[in-house]
Structure formats: structure tokens, C-alpha cells
Amino acid sequence: MFESDLSFYSALLILCCPISIVFFKKFPIKGYTGANKVSLFLQCLIAILNLNILYSFINSLTITLGHDGSSANTLTIDPITTTQQQGHVDYTPIKVSGYTFKNQVATKNLQCDSIVYDQDLDLQVSQAVDLNKPEDLKFFRDKLNELRSLNNIYDLFFQDNEDEVEESILERKWYKFCGSAVWLDKYGVYFMVNRIAYSKKGTRNNPTISVLAGQVFDKNWIELTGKKFPFSGLEFPTILPHYIDEGKEAEKVILGAEDPRVILHEYTNENGIRIQEPLIAFNALSTEVDWKRAMHIYRPLHDPHRIIRLSIENYAPREKEKNWAPFIDGNNLNFVYNFPLRILRCNINNGDCQKVSGPDFNDKSHENAGKLRGGTNLVEIPSQSLPKHLRSRKYWFGIARSHITDCGCVGELYRPHLILISRNKKSDQYELNYVSDLIDFNVNPEPWTPGKTTCSDGKSVLIPNSVAFIKDDYMSVTFSEADKTNKLINAKGWLTYITKMLEFTQERLKDESSDPVLESRLLSKCSTFLAQQYCALSKDTMGWDKLSR
């Protein structure tokens, strides 16, 4: 009935104030009789009630104005107007094609070229901005050195020979990547979580230990130092002091958090105050499941030390649980578990998860269709941003990724894919509506091995980490190259693209006879249909056979 707390408390004030005034006039206090004692008691209760409503109204008004003001200040023309690295934001066109069903019948033998969606729309991306600073790794190494006296597991970050100099250690053994960010409009800042990895042997893909670090940026992506949030003692930038399971093995390797993904979590606390906080999902090895890789959630501003392992009801832990893509639906924390589309709903207090949509967990349906995996968080598209005839469903937009082997001259290729999922507002069943071809945001990733060409290196890694900001036709995306960078691009025209695609497929969204599980499997499979064509073209246009750095 009420769309916001402000509307609710406004209505209460309008209702209660006149009633209270009438009561005070009808039953005035005259003397100290028994009747007047009752009137006095009731008037005190009414006064307290009105004061509480007024307090809640003012608090809701402050939050609402803070939200509106922050959003307005953030989006004058572009989501990013200036940064330390870049002044004017220049955009260049990007070609995106994908796959969706319109009137095709989903069959196991369906050809991917029959469900291509290839509209020539004005999608554009900015140049990439580097969010890592040269001094970041030294800062976080120094911070860990300070914290060693409080937590001896941090000693594992300092297993270097006495003759090694710090500059060489940082260059060969330390990495900062997987930067996932979210906009906290109540505070007018971006919260960003990073993975800080240390490898005793200098092998990036087999680190000794990893820990999460937090940074805060203003609306223009300028880092804020000494930043604190209400209800939290952490001061940013900082190492996030979450629990790290060190296992039972004598050799300590690949410990700690990997692949962090952050989303906005909002709730009302026991004092009636609306809270905004970052909620982080990550995977890590855990002794609770016999040293298997498990998913966890972490709320650094709520409890900076506690992590909660996620478990699926009636489903034994797999050897590796990873790549769950988080999103919020109402007050629920959900995850895209895998493709064909399975959705989990998880309790943030105890980590218990239930499958709420998608095929059952069994050997056959559990096989992943194609190469598609979870990538970023998913963000809900506001209903008011869509035409009225599309508002019977809720939609979420995100960026998945694929891992492809033997693609042209490259042995291993990781690339993003735009995805769109939805559900009818009267149902809990989610559907995968669209998946794009491989995209790269016009970025030519750094080679895995410095000094080599992409072809001679044989590995090209571009991982989307977060949809950090989304508003109208703009979005900001963070990504990493070669497991060693944190970068940001802005895109515009994305909402127009999605709206046109939904217009194209709207009749299919109403078709209750369709098979969403099979369609999801086919869309996932088709996502890499043109991979070989992409790699051949990229070799020529991006110079994969030439040294670029």
C-alpha cells in the first residue's frame, strides 16, 4: 500500500494529529480527580506516540532527501564526470549482439543462428580507468604488517627471504584485483572490495593466501581516506579483518577469500533506522566441509570478523562452490547458482539456502550448458524505467562470463556476456530471457605474461567484477585483466537496448506453454556460438599477434 517509509509516516501524522488535538480538547485536565488521572495518562501516551511518529517521519524524510540529493548530484550528464586519471569522458560505439526467443520453438536441435538478436542500436562505452594506484599494494602490505600482532595468520603474507627488497616482493608476489563496487546513495560514496593476494612462490594462479580489502570512493571515483560509516569502527581504506580458515594441512596454500562480489543490502534496524550496507559474497576453502571450496557471505560494517558459509538444503557440498551471482529481490538475498538457470534464496543470518527456481539437482540437469558462468552482481531494472506493458514482470540485469579453450590463437579465453533474467510478479519462477555474445567493452586485456603477445602467451583474461552503478541509460562496470588489475568503464545506451529487446520478445514473455529450462540451456549454449569468429576478428583488430605493451 505504501511505497516508502516516508509515505507511511506521513499518513500516520495526517491521521493521528487531528485525532490527538480533538482528544486533548474534549478531555482537558482539570484538577486531580480519578477521571483526570486517566485522561492525563492517555494524553501522555498519545503525546509519546506522536513524538515517535514525528521522529520516524523526520528520519525517513532525511534518508529520502539524502537519496534524492545524492542521485541528483551523481548524475548530471554522465555517471562519471571527472576522475584523478581522466578528465573528460569520451565514448566510442560498441557492437553487441545476442540471443533471445521470440516465436521460435525451443528444441534440443535448435540452431543458434535462429534466435539471434542483432539490432543496430547506439551502445557506447568509455575508455577504461585504472582504479589501482601504484602505492596501493605497499599500503595494504604495511597494514597487514601492523595487524600481525592481532592475528598471526597474517604472518603467511611475509614469507620472504631476508635479502629480498620490498619493491621486488611487491612486484613479483603481491596482487590486487577482483575489485567489486556498489553505490551507497545514503552516503554518496562507492564502496569497493578488492582481493589482495600473496604468493610465496610468485605464482599468480596459485597464491599462498588472500584477504579482502575495502576502499571508498566519491561520486567521481576519487578515493576517500579516513572514511568511516555509522555503526562501524572500520576506517577506510583498510584490510577487512574477516575470519580466514587456515585448514589442517602443514603446507598453507590458496587460503582465504576469492572472487568477492558486493551488493547493496538495505534493512531497518531495531531503532527504526534505515541501514545501507555492503554485503559481500566470496568463495574460500573451509574445514566445515572437509576443505572443499564453499561460498560465504560477509557484512563488514555489521560484523567485521564474522563470515557465514552458505549451504544448500538437501544438497551435499560439491568439491567447488563458486561463481554464484548475487542479487536482491524484495527483502531476499538470491543467487544465480548456474546455467541452465537455477536460483537460490539464502538466509543472511545463518547461510541456509533453498533452490526456489530451476531444474532439480541431479546428474543430468546439473551439467552446465555451454561455457557460461556467474560474473557480476545483478541489478534490478526499475519498473518505471520500462514501458507500462512490460511491467507485469521484474527484471534483473547482470554480466556473466565464459571460459573458452582453443579459441583462435588463444588457448584460454575469458570474456563477459550481458544477461537478463526475469520473473512474473505473481510467481517465484525465474527465466533467462537474453544472453549476449562475447563482449570486451573495446578493451584489449593485458597478456597474462608480460612481454608476450596475446597469441604467444595463449591466455586472455577479462573478468567482469561488478555492475557498480546503474541509472537511466548509464551504467558503470568494474573488471580485471589477467588477475592483476582493477579498472572501470562507463556504458550508455544499455537501457534502450534492453527495452528494445524486450519489445522484440514481449509475446514470448506471455507464453505460458514455453519451456524456460530448455530455453535457458539453449541460450547458455549459444552464448559462445560465435567465439571462433570473435577470436579471429580480435586477432586482427586488436593486434593479438603484436606486442602492445
From Swiss-Prot:
Q: Which residues lie on this side of the membrane: Extracellular?
A: 59-549
* Cross-referenced InterPro entries: BMT1
Q: Induction: what does the entry report?
A: Expression is induced in biofilm and by HAP43.
Q: Does the keyword Transferase apply?
A: yes
- EC number(s) on file: 2.4.1.-
Look up and give the membrane topology term. Single-pass type II membrane protein
GO BP:
beta-1,2-oligomannoside biosynthetic process; beta-1,2-oligomannoside metabolic process; cell wall organization; protein O-linked mannosylation
| Purpose | Beta-mannosyltransferase involved in cell wall biosynthesis. Required for addition of the second beta-mannose residue to acid-stable fraction of cell wall phosphopeptidomannan, and in elongation of beta-mannose chains on the phosphopeptidomannan acid-labile fraction.
Query: What is the recorded name of this protein?
Result: Beta-mannosyltransferase 3
Its lineage opens with:
Eukaryota, Fungi, Dikarya, Ascomycota, Saccharomycotina
